[in-house]
């Protein structure tokens, strides 16, 4: 009995060669629309789909394969006489191989000028139906959705006259993943169109970007997936120019650093980060000086850390950076001389280019946190804040220099693990106190790190101070200005303590926990 294949593809890469090889093996080819034209033009004989269905393609191609002669040929079980008799009685010929890929919905909606009508028109209906029918009947039918699988199918057909059950099962699993992702992307698009922020069903679509050697620790398996609709300014979109593959921990740290620097868009800025916490942030009129400030913030912790810059790296900055052991450098671009300096002297240094996007993250861009048996979803902590909305709650007003430093500190504290405290001046961090289980311990940690650089320094807290003993520690260190959300039932005690020591204190009204 002659074997039959149905081919209908939007991605025509390799399809002519694949069909030619099938012809050599004696296969009969059914095809549709543009695929048939491409094969016919290449000299590959095909049968038109309407010759099989008895109906013409209609409604601008919306209806062409949704027919019992197609789906009966795909779904008939070869091991059931009743199925085979039904097919024979209804003059349905069996189809043994399906090669289909779908309308380019993703590519369509990524176009900057796409219209809603264009998006809707690129939702494939017949393609997923054929794929699912063939995949369901994988005991008898081979289904191919990815051109990368053409070779293995041809090899098995040439060697054995058929594909193995293991191959058919693997390809069926691939099809169900593919159609599920395709439908999820359509659902995501429509959900966004109607402004639904809390859908009752949540399906996320990601594509495998990089298999990883291991996860956070060597005993943990890991892989890196990228959003099907990529975010421009993200670690997943960065171009690697040098060094080994990024590790699991590299990617997490780099992501954290990129999130931080996105908030420092107005001036040349350098962020140094270690274990998801900033260990140095420097801001200046030029990127070399910003590097100096970031490095001087904590010359010890930066060792083995990640550095991200929001301006092009020049030779002078590269010379300074190459003298420090770093895991990763991320910048919008590098001069040729700077890149040569970094690559020649640091063969394993991971160097990434990521064009800086000064646009702030969208509040509607979700963050996902896995818990056992569930998933927490929240929008990003990108609430727009203005110093004009802040409240000075003490008798003493901040000086102009203190006000600038407080604004700098408030941007930085958002990215310190809670309980988080940070000490800064108006252009660099001086001490970071992250992740302590009581706030006064974080205060002491940040102050101890700042040491003899506290003259003119300010302090920021990611959440309110629960007790007035915190202000005593701060005042004792010589810090004269504090910024915090406020909101404690003991706020008045803290305000009175600040007044007692001659401090100025600002309440922002916004908390920035980070766990």
Swiss-Prot record:
GO biological process: 'de novo' IMP biosynthetic process
GO molecular function: IMP cyclohydrolase activity; phosphoribosylaminoimidazolecarboxamide formyltransferase activity
Keyword Transferase in annotation: yes
Domain of life: Bacteria
NCBIfam families to which the protein is assigned, alphabetical: PRK00881.1, purH
HAMAP family noted in UniProt: PurH (MF_00139)
Name the UniProt record assigns to this protein: Bifunctional purine biosynthesis protein PurH
Organism for this UniProt entry: Streptococcus pneumoniae (strain ATCC 700669 / Spain 23F-1)
Lineage, uppermost ranks: Bacteria, Bacillati, Bacillota, Bacilli, Lactobacillales
Gene behind the chain: purH
């Amino acid at each position: 009995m002659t074997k039959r294949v149905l081919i209908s593809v939007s991605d025509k890469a390799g399809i002519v060669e694949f069909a030619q090889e099938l012809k050599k093996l004696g296969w009969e080819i059914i095809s549709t629309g543009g695929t048939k034209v491409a094969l016919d033009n290449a000299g590959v004989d095909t049968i038109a789909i309407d010759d099989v269905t008895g109906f013409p393609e209609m409604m601008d191609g919306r209806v062409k394969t949704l027919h019992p002669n197609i789906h009966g040929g795909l779904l008939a079980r070869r091991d059931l006489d009743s199925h085979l008799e039904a097919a024979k009685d209804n003059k349905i010929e069996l189809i043994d191989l399906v090669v289909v890929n779908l309308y380019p919905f993703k590519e369509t909606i990524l176009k900057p000028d796409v219209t809603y009508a264009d998006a809707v028109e690129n939702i494939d209906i017949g393609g997923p139906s054929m794929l699912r029918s063939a995949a369901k009947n994988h005991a008898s039918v081979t289904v191919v959705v990815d051109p990368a699988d053409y070779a293995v199918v041809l090899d098995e057909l040439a060697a054995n006259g058929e594909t193995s059950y293991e191959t058919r099962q693997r390809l069926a699993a691939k099809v169900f993943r593919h159609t599920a992702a395709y439908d999820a992307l359509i659902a995501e698009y429509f959900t966004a169109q109607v402004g639904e922020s809390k859908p009752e069903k949540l399906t996320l679509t990601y594509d495998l970007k990089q298999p990883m050697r291991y996860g956070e620790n060597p005993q943990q398996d890991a892989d890196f997936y990228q959003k099907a609709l990529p975010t421009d300014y993200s670690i997943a979109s960065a171009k690697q120019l040098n060094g080994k593959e990024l590790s699991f921990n590299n990617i997490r740290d780099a992501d954290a650093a990129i999130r931080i620097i996105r908030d420092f868009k107005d001036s040349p800025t350098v962020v140094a980060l270690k274990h998801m916490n900033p260990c140095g942030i420097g801001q200046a009129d030029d990127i070399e000086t910003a590097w100096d400030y970031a490095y001087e913030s904590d010359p010890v912790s930066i060792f083995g850390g990640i550095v991200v810059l929001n301006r092009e790296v020049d030779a002078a900055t590269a010379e300074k950076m190459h003298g420090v052991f770093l895991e990763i450098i991320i910048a919008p671009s590098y001069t040729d001389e700077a890149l040569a300096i970094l690559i020649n002297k640091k063969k394993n240094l991971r160097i990434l280019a990521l064009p800086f996007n000064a646009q702030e993250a969208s509040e509607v861009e979700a963050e996902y946190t896995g818990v056992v048996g569930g998933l927490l979803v929240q929008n990003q902590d990108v609430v727009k804040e203005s110093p004009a909305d802040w409240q000075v709650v003490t008798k003493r007003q901040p000086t102009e220099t203190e006000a600038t430093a407080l604004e700098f500190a408030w941007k930085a504290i958002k990215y310190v693990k809670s309980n988080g405290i940070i000490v800064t001046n108006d252009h660099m961090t001086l001490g970071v106190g992250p992740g302590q289980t009581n706030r006064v311990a974080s205060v002491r940690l940040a102050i101890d790190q700042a040491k003899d650089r506290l003259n003119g320094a300010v302090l920021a807290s990611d959440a309110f101070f629960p007790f007035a003993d915190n202000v005593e520690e701060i005042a004792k260190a010589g810090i004269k200005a504090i910024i915090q959300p406020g909101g404690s039932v003991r706020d008045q005690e803290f305000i009175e303590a600040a007044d007692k020591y001659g401090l100025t204190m600002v309440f922002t009204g916004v908390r920035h926990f980070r766990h």
